[in-house]
């Protein structure tokens, strides 16, 4: 599998989870994800087939290509990117899905934008799906580089 969504979709196709209608995917680089992040993703599935969460992006992260920026209109994601935008919210690596979109994910085209940005959620957007997004309080650390691991350990000593 190339990304977390493909892994979750693969698990769904194995039919081991037939009794469930909703799923959550927490990216491995987000060790500080809180229950609130997961709960909001799942709660917003009443309005959308695919959901995610975000928080205010610290200014120091705006130009960091490892930090994913979310551009949105209200509670709907318009774009995700790694570029130096100087604006955008901090996209946190938590996704909620209803079952049907996961069954379809493997037939959606991998786009140039997804390959360049290395962001799986762009496949949804470029295929015409809407992604719902909700704000959460988050002051954790995202692990993107070895120095992030050191910073995370310092927070928990």
Residue map of PLM features:
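Short beta-strands and strand-loop turn motifs
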Residues: 23-25, 51-53, 132-136
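Conserved alpha/beta core of the MobA/IspD/sugar-nucleotide pyrophosphorylase nucleotidyltransferase superfamily
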Residues: 90-157
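Short, high-confidence coil segments that cap the C-terminus of an alpha-helix
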Residues: 19-20, 46-50, 129
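Conserved core of the sugar-phosphate nucleotidyltransferase
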Residues: 33-111
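Conserved beta-strand edge residues that scaffold enzyme active sites
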Residues: 1-2, 57, 138-139
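One-carbon transfer enzymes
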Residues: 1-5, 65, 143, 153
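Short phosphate-binding loop-to-helix
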Residues: 1-26, 30-43
């Amino acid at each position: 599998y190339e990304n977390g969504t493909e892994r979750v979709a693969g698990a769904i196709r194995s039919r081991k989870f037939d009794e469930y209608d909703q799923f959550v995917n927490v990216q491995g680089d987000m060790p500080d994800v809180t229950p609130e992040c997961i709960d909001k993703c799942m709660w917003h599935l009443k309005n959308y087939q695919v959901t995610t969460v975000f928080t205010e992006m610290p200014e120091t992260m705006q130009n960091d290509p490892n930090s994913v920026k979310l551009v949105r209109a209200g509670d709907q994601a318009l774009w995700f990117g790694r570029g130096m935008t100087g604006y955008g919210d901090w996209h946190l690596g938590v996704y909620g899905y209803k079952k049907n979109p996961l069954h379809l994910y493997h037939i959606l085209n991998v786009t140039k934008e997804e390959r360049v940005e290395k962001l799986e959620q762009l496949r949804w957007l470029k295929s015409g799906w809407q992604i719902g997004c909700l704000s959460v309080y988050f002051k954790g650390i995202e692990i993107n580089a070895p120095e992030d691991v050191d910073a995370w350990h310092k927070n928990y000593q």
